[in-house]
Structures are given as C-alpha cells and as structure tokens.
C-alpha cells in the first residue's frame, strides 16, 4: 500500500494486501485494486498516526472463524534460544536409628527456534545419598508447522504427541493434523442446525440458558454449523425472530459422541521409526473423517516385524436417543501364545435435559489372550504387560440438583480370563455451596472390591471437605478442613490455611494433620521473583523432619540480548518497551519488565490473535505510552516480539485560556507538535493533561472549524508539581492562525508562552482569510501573515533557508530563533509606529540589512535604529551620530558586524524598526528585509 509522489492523493492498495486482511477478492497480487467500482470500499487515512481504516461491504468478508487469524498473518517469531531450568533438593532427617537421606534434581530444557523450526531437548540430573550424580536425556527432536496443509512435522528421538495411539519412545518422524490451525467450529463436532426463515430474521442458539450464537439470515432455508458449543451436553434451544416480531422455536437434541468430528473435517496421524525397547521398525497410520448425517468414521493401522493391528470405528448422533460409537479391533502379536486377538468397544452417551442428568456407558470385550496395541506388545517383551483382560464396563451418571449442588456416580467392573479375578470400584460424590455461597462443601464415598474365587477384599473410604475463601487480595485467603475415614481403619484430619502477600508474589500454606495419635505440621511457600520462582517447605512429625527447596526460571537469548524470567510455557512473546522499566503486563500476574523495559511471557494461543497490554498505572512517573496494547499471532512454539513506543518526559497539567481569559472549551483537540503528533483532549476549565512531555514543546489546539477556533501554544515546564508528580502550568493569550513548527524555542522564559503559530515545511499550500501565502521547495519556504495588535510571533525550524513577512499594524514583536538556520530573510510591511525584532543567535558572523520601498507619494522616509545596551556594534556603511540609517541610503545593503576582536554577534540582542511619514493623507507601505548568515547549521 503506497502513495505515488507527485501524483494525486489517491493511494494504491494491492490485491495481496486485501487478501491478507481477509477480503475475498481476486486479481493480480501486485496490481492496485479498483476500490470504488469493484469493491465499493471506503477508506480513511490518518497521516500523523500512519493509520489506514478500510470499510468493506460484508459480502466481501467471510464469516469470522472463531478467532483463527488468516494464514498470512501467522508469525514464526524470532530466532532465539530459550532455556528453562528447575533445580531442587530434598533432605530427610529420620528420628531414631534410621539414616538421613537427601536427593538433588535438575531439569534443563533448551528450546531453539530457527525460522519455522523448533528444536527441543531435555537433560535431567539426579543424585542422592546412595548414587552418584548422572545426566540423562529424554528427547531430542525438531518440529515445525506446515500451514499449507495444516499439519505438523516431528523428526527426532522422543515421545511424540499422538492422539489415536498409545505413546512410546522411538526414533523417527511424525506427520499429523495440527488441530490448532483449524477454527473450533470446523474441527469440533456440533450438530448442523437447519431451519427456514419467512423474512430476514435473527437466529439465536441457547445452551443451558446461555446464548452461544446470534446471526442474521435471509428469507428461505438456512443451515448453520459455524458456532461454538458451551462445553456442556445440553440440547440446543433455537429461536428464529422474524422482522415482524413473530418467533419460531425448536430444540436440536445434542450429546457429545465418543467418536465424532465436524462434517468435512479430517484428522490424520502418520508415524514411522525405530522403537527404543526392541530396535524394531514400525509404522502407524490413523484417519478420522466427519461424514454427512452426523456420522464419523475412524480407522487406524499399526505394523512392525512382530506385530500388526487394525481398528475401524464409527460414531453416530441418534438425536433424542443420544450418541453411539462402535470400534472393532484385531491384533496379531507373533511373540505371544495367543497371537490373534480381537476386541469390541461400544460407547453410549445420553443427555436428559428434563432430569438435568447426563449418562455415559462403555463396554470393552476381548477374546482370550486380549487385544493389544503396539505399546502393549513392547511392554510384554520386558514383562510389564499380560494379555489377561476379558470384559470391562464403565458407567457414569451426573445429576444437577440446582441450588442444592450436584451429585455424581461412576462405577467400573472388570474380569479376566486366566484367574477368574474380578475388580469393582464405585465412586459417589456430592458438592454444593453453603452459607449463601460463602463456603464450599464436598464429600465422596469410594468403594473398591477385588474378588478371587471365594476370597473378597474390599475397602471403603469416606471423604468430607469444607473450604472457606475470604476473597482477600492479601493476607489469609482461605481456610480448609478435610477428613478421611477408612472403614475398619484409621481416620485422618487436615486443617489448612493459605494466603498471599506482596501483590500475590508470595504464596504460603500451613497445614496441621492428625491421624491415630500421629501428627504432622507442614509449611510450604513460593515467591514469584522477577527473574525466577523460588520455593521452600518444611514439615515436622514424630518420625522425621523434612526440608526441601528449589528454584526455577528461564533464560532467553535473541539478537536483542538476554532476558531472564520465569518459565512460562512454549509459545511466547518478547516485550520490548524501552523507558517502561518495572512495568506490569496485564493479565500475567506479577510479571513485569526489567530495568531495560524488557520481559517475556508464554502460554500464548497459537494461530490466534493475542492481546498483550502494559499496565499504564505501573509506568514510571516520567513515561507514557501511545498505545498500551499490541497484538501478536504466533505459530506453535514461536517466540514473537512486540515493541511499545514509550515517551519519556514530565507529566504536565496545563490550563489553556483564550486571549479574553476564557478557558479553551471542553473537548478541544490538542496535538503535541513533535515527530509523533500525539493527541489529547481538553477537560473541564481548559485543563489539559499531557501524559509525557519534554521540558518545552508546542501544542496545536482546535475546538471548531473557524480560524478563530484554532491556536498554537508553546510551553516550558517548571519545577511546580503536585503530590502525584504532575507538573502544573498555564497558557494565557492563545491566538488563532497557525504555521509550521520544527524545533523548540530555546530562549523563552515563561512557564507557558503563547504564540500565533508554527509552520512545517512539508505543506505546499495553506490559506486563511487571504492573508496566508506559503511556498515550499525542498528545504526552503516563505510565509506572509497578519500579526495584529499586541501579538507575538515565533518562527523556528530545521530548514536551511527561510523567509518571513509580517504586516506590522501596531507595535508587534517578532521573536526569532536562528539556532538551526543558515540564512533567514525577514521582511516587514509596516504602515505606522514601531516594530521590534528580538533575536536569539547561534554564532552569527554578520547580519545584512536589506530594503525595498513602495512609495505612494514620494515623500515617505524610514530608518533602522539598532539598540543594544551591553555592547557597541557598527554598520559597515556610514552611519549618522545617532546610529540611524536612512532607508534610502542603504539600497546596496548594510552589515551589522561584531566589534573589533569579536568573532560573532552576541547571543541575544534587539533591533528596533521605526517608520514615519511626512504626509498623513496617504498610507505608506515599506518592505524591510534582514539577510542573516550563520557559520553554524
């Protein structure tokens, strides 16, 4: 997107830019899109903020995909090395003759990012009083995303994340669907809602009384699938609101099937490599596809030299009858006596909204010897698995009691082929709020049984717990009590108190336990420091004392340097905010920037927009932010960088007043006329707060459309500040009209100095009441303006040459700072009385006086008077005794030069212009100029 220099103000937006932001257009990516005719786009461009707003018709913008960003906006992040570490030590002192023991542990996980590649490894060190310390490596692999096929590739040695297979360690590679690259509504099963609207209507979905979807549909049939469920198993309540207010209502039955993905979604896994346990090569393939009519099909294959298996599954939504899934599997393990085995796996789910009840049931039946996965076969070789299971059944019931709480039951029953053993377990639990929601009560009854022939072993445990949160930001936050009783055995009681301090950086917990004349007191806490987290604990009992402690954190190295911090997940962001040292990051607890304004955070959502905000209330007093929130869209495992523009300076409160003493109106727009063009709004009574200001600056104030509703204010911040560290100032005599500004005025002494205006050289034309005329070529420009009675004017700038002109109607003062300028031409058209020019110089070697005369009646005369009380100067042409120079006598120019022995003119002096006329009947007009030459640019 760009402007053509010298052409019209129309700009070019390439098709590629529109496509990147999600507009559905087609065309040559490098060509400019036809905005008006083709797309009917509207645009708005802010030159100062460099912001372009594009307004697009909804028909060119596809429906938002539930937070997933366009692929072209995904950020692979910085090349960086992040290393997390965890060091801990335990020490036990046993009372009596037992020997004390200790152990030491270290876990170091370097993570290297190079472009889209993520290289991961882990090193673990263990040592105790019985063994020497030794290092071990759990994994070393590289991974990357493949956005064009929405997949993820892993290559190396380790445990790889596979959804449809039991995990084991191997050397090889994995290619699988990256579900994070799909929006939730495209991958997760939810029923397609179909209906018909008589008019343009609003369609709303509700689940458990909560609105989860709302959209406008045209007249006719509609089919909606791009919505996100609330996470419950409740039916969908659909409301269609027509234009005339009539409402259609219907219910769509829903239950999460055990095997189900969205129609059209495909999930696959491919794994190949060499197993660590047996050094055998293997292949694993898995494929899941969502089909029409609420069907989902699943198939998987595992193959090795000694093992092979096949699974086929089918899931189906049954509407009001619930959801059913069926999986059939067959395996062949050549190293087992029962090599050919089969299994059937049936799962059923049903939600009953009228009873606030959810049911689930599963049954698995296996042939003699038992079905095995490849992981089972590998464990069998080292004696860690036996193919003995025959049937297993699992059931659960979840029932809501409304304000009385919730009641849940689950049970498992299993039998075996060889020894006729049976195992059963039951769990009944209840939870509710008590004391009007000020405390929580929970309880559970757990029973387990093991039956072998005529023997039966059972165990029953009753647990009851109460938790009372205080909702405090510091100090004691909660008190809890838990008791556990074993039938025919001991009972235990635990009383705990938890709290936090220092803005939740310090967490602590104290627990007192008692069981059968045996007591235990323990204390535990951790502190979230800026660069690491430390933890420690100590417990005392009749048998032993136990002390432990540790430290964990992370070190990030990238091209910008080194950042220390806590270990914060895999997908991360670097924060760079120079000038915002020790500033908190919103939503990240106690994490804050270091002394350079740098930090890192983690646990970002990949492929989605993540907002990262600095807390302005924690900024240093002399800092402010133009924008407090930046957005990043990282890929999985990326370390992206986000930068904040921090302004250093005093926080200033000004009172802006017009020349008549009235305050500048509420809501007036104020622009700080520096390189960043920051804007603010005037508050009540003309008060203006500048979040960050230099000691001096210039403000442009606008409160209306007319020239009498505009002004420019210069200010200097003094030392007057209030208890909050805000400096106080005021602005009197604010004037309309404005020119351009380039540099601060260094010689002003007032805390706030009013000026007529300032001019910036990039403007080509500016006109106001036919009095303003500007011209600009490269670095040179000239201005004519009306000064008026009692007005002051200040002109400064980084340009090389500048010309100024003024109608001196009644004793005006022109204040000129020549500091950055090499040549200045100052001209004055004056009709009567006196004009004064106050100069501030920067190593000026001479000033040349120039004049041209517009004579109306031939009788007018005028002269310069040079005045300075601190030194004597001469003009190179012949002067009269009064140092007056007749204008008619200096047609070739006259120079003001330093006195003998001096190299430059003084830093500040005053030159007074005076004109008189011999006839009062005809107005006279003179043009007087100054050519100032400096040897310093």
Swiss-Prot record:
UniProt GO molecular function: fimbrial usher porin activity
UniProt keyword terms in alphabetical order: Cell outer membrane, Fimbrium biogenesis, Membrane, RNA suppression of termination, Transmembrane, Transmembrane beta strand, Transport
Subcellular location: Cell outer membrane
Pfam families referenced in this protein's UniProt entry, alphabetically: PapC_C, PapC_N, Usher
Domain of life: Bacteria
Modifications after synthesis and translation: A 97 kDa form of the protein is thought to be due to post-translational processing of isoform 104 kDa.
GO cellular component entries: cell outer membrane
Signal peptide: none
Recorded topology in the membrane: Multi-pass membrane protein
Coiled-coil residues: none
One Gene Ontology term from the biological process aspect of the record: pilus assembly
PANTHER family in UniProt: F1 CAPSULE-ANCHORING PROTEIN, OUTER MEMBRANE USHER PROTEIN
Primary role: These proteins are essential for the biogenesis of mature CS3 pili, but not for synthesis of the CS3 pilin subunit.
Family: Belongs to the fimbrial export usher family.
Remaining remarks: Suppression of amber codon 754 seems to be amino acid specific; a supE suppressor (usually Gln) permits function, whereas a supF suppressor (Tyr) does not.
Name recorded for this polypeptide: Outer membrane usher protein CS3-2
Taxonomy of the source species: Bacteria, Pseudomonadati, Pseudomonadota, Gammaproteobacteria, Enterobacterales
């Amino acid at each position: 997107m760009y402007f053509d220099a010298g052409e019209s103000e129309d700009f070019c937006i390439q098709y590629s830019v529109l496509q990147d932001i999600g507009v559905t257009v087609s065309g040559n990516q490098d060509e400019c899109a036809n905005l008006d005719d083709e797309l009917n786009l509207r645009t708005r461009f802010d030159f100062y903020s460099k912001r372009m707003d594009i307004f697009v018709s909804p028909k060119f913008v596809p429906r938002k995909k539930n937070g997933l960003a366009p692929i072209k906006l995904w950020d692979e992040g910085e090349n960086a090395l992040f290393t997390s570490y965890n060091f801990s030590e335990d020490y036990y002192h046993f009372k009596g003759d037992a020997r004390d023991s200790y152990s030491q542990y270290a876990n170091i996980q370097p993570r290297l990012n190079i472009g889209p590649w993520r290289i991961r490894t882990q090193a673990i060190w263990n040592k105790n009083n019985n063994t020497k310390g030794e290092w071990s490596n759990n994994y070393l692999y590289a991974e990357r995303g493949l956005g064009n096929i929405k997949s993820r590739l892993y290559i190396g040695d380790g445990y790889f994340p596979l959804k449809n297979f039991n995990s084991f360690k191997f050397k090889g590679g994995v290619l699988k669907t990256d579900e994070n690259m799909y929006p939730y509504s495209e991958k997760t099963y939810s029923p397609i809602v179909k209906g018909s609207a008589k008019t343009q209507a609003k369609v709303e979905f509700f689940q458990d009384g909560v609105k989860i979807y709302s959209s406008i549909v045209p007249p006719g049939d509609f089919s909606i699938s791009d919505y996100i469920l609330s996470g419950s198993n409740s039916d969908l309540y659909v409301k269609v609101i027509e234009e005339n207010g009539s409402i259609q209502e219907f219910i769509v039955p829903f239950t999460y099937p055990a095997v189900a993905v969205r129609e059209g979604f495909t999930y696959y896994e491919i794994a190949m490599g060499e197993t660590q346990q047996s050094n055998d090569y293997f292949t694993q393939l898995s494929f899941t596809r969502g089909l029409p009519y609420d069907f989902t099909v699943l198939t998987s294959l595992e193959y090795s030299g000694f093992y092979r298996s096949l699974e086929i599954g089918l899931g189906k939504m049954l509407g009001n009858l619930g959801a059913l899934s069926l999986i059939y599997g067959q395996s062949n393990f050549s190293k087992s006596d029962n090599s050919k085995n089969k299994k059937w796996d049936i799962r059923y789910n049903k939600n009953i909204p009228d009873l606030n009840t959810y049911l689930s049931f599963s049954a698995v039946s296996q042939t003699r010897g038992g079905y095995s996965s490849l992981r089972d076969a590998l464990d069998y070789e080292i004696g860690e698995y036996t193919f003995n299971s025959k049937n297993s059944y699992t059931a659960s019931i979840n029932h809501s009691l409304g304000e009385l709480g919730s009641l849940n039951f689950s049970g498992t029953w299993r039998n075996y082929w060889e020894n006729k053993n049976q195992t059963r377990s039951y769990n009944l639990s209840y939870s509710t709020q008590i004391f009007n929601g000020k405390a929580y009560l929970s309880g559970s009854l757990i029973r387990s049984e093991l039956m072998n022939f005529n023997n039966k072993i059972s165990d029953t445990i009753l647990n009851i717990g109460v938790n009372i949160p205080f909702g405090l930001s510091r100090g004691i936050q909660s008190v809890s009590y838990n008791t556990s009783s074993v039938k025919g055995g001991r009972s235990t009681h635990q009383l705990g108190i938890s709290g936090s301090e220092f803005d939740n950086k310090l967490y602590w917990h104290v627990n007192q336990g008692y069981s059968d004349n045996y007591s235990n007191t323990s204390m535990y806490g951790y502190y979230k420091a800026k660069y690491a987290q430390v933890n420690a604990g100590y417990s005392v009992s009749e048998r032993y004392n136990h002390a432990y402690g540790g430290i964990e954190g992370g070190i990030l190295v990238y091209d910008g340097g080194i950042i220390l911090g806590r270990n914060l997940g895999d997908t991360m962001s670097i924060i760079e905010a120079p000038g915002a040292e020790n500033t908190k990051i919103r939503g990240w607890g106690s994490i804050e920037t270091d002394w350079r304004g740098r930090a890192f955070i983690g646990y970002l959502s990949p492929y989605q927009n993540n907002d990262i905000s600095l807390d302005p209330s924690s900024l240093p007093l002399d800092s402010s932010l133009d924008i407090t929130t930046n957005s990043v869209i990282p890929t999985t495992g990326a370390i992206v960088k986000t930068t904040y523009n921090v302004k250093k300076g005093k926080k200033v409160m000004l009172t802006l007043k017009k020349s008549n003493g009235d305050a500048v109106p509420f809501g007036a727009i104020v622009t700080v006329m520096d390189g960043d063009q920051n804007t603010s709004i005037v508050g009540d009574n003309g008060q203006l707060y500048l979040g960050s200001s230099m000691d001096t600056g210039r403000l442009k104030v606008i409160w209306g459309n007319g020239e009498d509703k505009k002004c420019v204010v210069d200010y200097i911040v003094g030392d007057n500040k209030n208890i909050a560290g805000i400096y106080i100032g005021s602005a009197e005599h604010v004037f309309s009209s404005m020119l351009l500004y380039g540099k601060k005025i260094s010689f002003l002494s007032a805390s706030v100095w009013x000026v007529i205006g300032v001019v910036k050289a990039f403007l080509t034309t500016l006109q106001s009441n036919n009095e303003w005329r500007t011209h600009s070529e490269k670095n040179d420009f000239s201005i004519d303006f009306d000064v008026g009675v009692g007005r002051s004017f200040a002109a400064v700038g980084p340009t090389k040459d500048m010309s100024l002109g003024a109608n001196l109607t009644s004793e005006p003062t022109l204040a000129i700072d020549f500091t950055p300028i090499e040549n200045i031409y100052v001209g004055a058209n004056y009709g009567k009385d006196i004009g004064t020019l106050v100069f501030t110089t920067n190593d000026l070697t001479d000033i040349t006086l120039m004049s041209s005369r517009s004579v109306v009646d031939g009788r007018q005369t005028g002269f310069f008077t040079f005045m300075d009380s601190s030194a004597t100067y001469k003009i190179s042409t012949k002067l009269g005794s009064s140092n007056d120079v007749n204008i008619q006598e200096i047609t070739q120019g006259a120079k003001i030069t330093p006195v003998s022995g001096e190299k430059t003119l003084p830093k500040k002096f005053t030159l007074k212009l005076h004109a008189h006329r011999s006839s009062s009947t005809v107005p006279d007009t003179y043009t007087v100029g100054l050519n100032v030459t400096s040897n310093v640019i």
